[in-house]
Amino acid sequence: MYPRGVKRSQHDRHKQTAFRTIKRSITHRPTSKFISHFAKNFRGKLAPLKQLDESRLDALSLTELEQLKTIIEEKQQEKRAQNNAITFLPNLPTVPFADTNFSIKSLGLRPYNGDARDPKQRIRDRFPQTHERICLLTNDILETDLLLRYRQCLDSLTREENQQLMGDRIFSLTNSPCLAFTVATVEEACSYFKFHDLHNLPVNPQDLFMYTITVMKFEFFNKLNMAKLTCVFNDNGHGDIEYRKLRQLCGKPVLDREMPNSEFEVQQQTPDSFRHPIQQAMSIVVTFARILRQIKEHIIRTKKPQFIRDFDTERVAERYECGLISRLIGKQFSNHKCDDVSCQNRIERIMAPWKPSLFFCTYFAKDAPKFKLFPNLPHEYRNLSFTCPKVDMEPSCSYSTSRDLPQTSHRSHKNQGTPKVKSKVCVEKPDTSNLTTTKTTTEILIEESMETDNKIPDPRELNFNQAKQDEIVIININENVNSKHESESSVEMDLDLDYEADTCETNLNTYSSDSE
């Protein structure tokens, strides 16, 4: 407030009026005074938002709402196409990805003369054959033309073949049996990345190995996360904080605690700045994924070939060596020592492949399913079918009719009298001179049981069979009442309850063997 007798200056009056006008425009209050240029622009931006009124939407009919829904979906597809242009690359020519200008002599490579198969056959077959060599030395990977031939084969694939190949690789990554297989896949992609950086080749973002590095980052973290990482990182102290750093490095949310650095700052750090080997290995994969994302963006914008050296400012690819990630992971887990049995068991499980536990088969040879495999598989793998050996005995789940079963005397429910003599059942033996036309009794029973299962029962027949069964039971009971019964001690089998109790007892102290 100004003192009495002092008038406000004209400048302050205009400033206060402009502030009041902006405040009214923000709160959508009508005003009769002049509106500043800022308020006009602000109100113009709010005009489309006013059109989305609930009363107007309620006034629309069902047809108009369907049309509005169609328009919104089309706009969303256009937005997705613009945002995902880096992924699909629809308007890019093949010139930035072509490597026809590069030869073995210009790159300083030597021809590969090892035992590995031709890259065209490997890409066609999707997985190695039996006893095929896939473990290569570092010199064979970086100094020969083997990876260059892989690059040429991948560039020559059609869009459908490339998508099929990438889908198979992503499926194998997400369903990896153990951490060892995931680490081997990550090493394969990083070695391919190293080869492009070493020989300064232009990057193809649609490449099989380049495209799936981002997927590898998340699957690599998922496999590592199966271990008790808070205990593994606790060797140098602060295991919880180091685990949260790993989550930030992989882009996973950390909401339960405030971290000193943001996710962006952690991902920009070099691998050498981290304390633990697992963090260093993850930092290498994250750095390669970030470089590829930047390369994709520049290819979309410039439509020119891009190289790794132009984006790898910290020279991470230059310092990377083939097999470095597996050595870092092995170093971290092998040097970890703790008294936690669950931590040791987890490390052992994630490093060893899972073992299937199929103890018996429920399929018969006749009903066994036959799985059709991919037509591009090798010839020796095309005729695979999941079958079980032929069963000669009748399955326990099937049943036979009462007229086909051998007639045996029924025991009485009473426990008195002398034992009765078991009646012998005579089964006609098949003629050995005509084996081709004769069927065994078991096969006849199986066929009749299958026919009975497939037949629709008649209610009248069911009632007749039930009455006939009751009549047979009554006759058998009346016959056995007048007969003498055997004593209880000579017939009844004593259950060895002590043996069952010993075998069914669960020993709760079974952790001593694990700790040893």
UniProtKB/Swiss-Prot annotation:
<keyword id="KW-0946">Virion</keyword>
<feature type="binding site">
    <location>
        <position position="338"/>
    </location>
    <ligand>
        <name>Zn(2+)</name>
    </ligand>
</feature>
<feature type="zinc finger region" description="CHC2-type">
    <location>
        <begin position="231"/>
        <end position="343"/>
    </location>
</feature>
<keyword id="KW-1048">Host nucleus</keyword>
<feature type="region of interest" description="Disordered">
    <location>
        <begin position="399"/>
        <end position="423"/>
    </location>
</feature>
<feature type="compositionally biased region" description="Polar residues">
    <location>
        <begin position="399"/>
        <end position="409"/>
    </location>
</feature>
<feature type="binding site">
    <location>
        <position position="231"/>
    </location>
    <ligand>
        <name>Zn(2+)</name>
    </ligand>
</feature>
<keyword id="KW-0862">Zinc</keyword>
<keyword id="KW-0479">Metal-binding</keyword>
<dbReference type="GO" id="GO:0019033">
    <property type="term" value="C:viral tegument"/>
</dbReference>
<dbReference type="Pfam" id="PF05459">
    <property type="entry name" value="Herpes_UL69"/>
</dbReference>
<keyword id="KW-0920">Virion tegument</keyword>
<keyword id="KW-0804">Transcription</keyword>
<feature type="binding site">
    <location>
        <position position="343"/>
    </location>
    <ligand>
        <name>Zn(2+)</name>
    </ligand>
</feature>
<keyword id="KW-0805">Transcription regulation</keyword>
<keyword id="KW-0863">Zinc-finger</keyword>
<comment type="function">
    <text>Immediate early (EI) protein that plays many roles during productive infection including regulation of viral gene expression and nuclear export of intronless viral RNAs.</text>
</comment>
<dbReference type="GO" id="GO:0008270">
    <property type="term" value="F:zinc ion binding"/>
</dbReference>
<protein>
    <recommendedName>
        <fullName>mRNA export factor ICP27 homolog</fullName>
    </recommendedName>
</protein>
<feature type="binding site">
    <location>
        <position position="336"/>
    </location>
    <ligand>
        <name>Zn(2+)</name>
    </ligand>
</feature>
<dbReference type="GO" id="GO:0006355">
    <property type="term" value="P:regulation of DNA-templated transcription"/>
</dbReference>
<dbReference type="GO" id="GO:0030430">
    <property type="term" value="C:host cell cytoplasm"/>
</dbReference>
<dbReference type="InterPro" id="IPR008648">
    <property type="entry name" value="ICP27-like"/>
</dbReference>
<dbReference type="GO" id="GO:0042025">
    <property type="term" value="C:host cell nucleus"/>
</dbReference>
<keyword id="KW-1035">Host cytoplasm</keyword>
<comment type="similarity">
    <text>Belongs to the HHV-1 ICP27 protein family.</text>
</comment>
